[in-house]
């Protein structure tokens, strides 16, 4: 719904901010590992997924 779209848009903006870039790698690695585990892929495969698909998996699990 609209709320989820807003969260994704905001997440994109936040992830692109300078402050976030310092923290992003740790968070992204944790998210990649999580997504990879859920879909049975390797973290590097999970990292190559489109952002929206990646966020959908985080959302639905």
UniProtKB/Swiss-Prot annotation:
InterPro entries: Antimicrobial_7 (IPR012526). It is found in: Secreted; Target cell membrane. It comes from the Eukaryota. Pfam families: Antimicrobial_7. Residues 45-61 form a propeptide. Disulfide bonds: none annotated. GO terms for cellular component: extracellular region; membrane; other organism cell membrane. Keywords: Antibiotic, Antimicrobial, Cytolysis, Fungicide, Hemolysis, Ion transport, Membrane, Secreted, Target cell membrane, Target membrane, Transmembrane, Transport. One of its GO terms (biological process) is hemolysis in another organism. Expressed by the venom gland. Belongs to the non-disulfide-bridged peptide (NDBP) superfamily. Long chain multifunctional peptide (group 2) family. At high concentrations, acts as a pore former in cellular membranes and causes the leakage of the cells. At submicromolar concentrations, degranulates granulocytes and has a weak hemolytic activity against human erythrocytes. Also strongly inhibits the production of superoxide anions. Has a strong antibacterial activity against Gram-negative bacteria but is less active against Gram-positive bacteria. Also has antifungal activity. This is Opistoporin-4. It comes from Opistophthalmus carinatus.
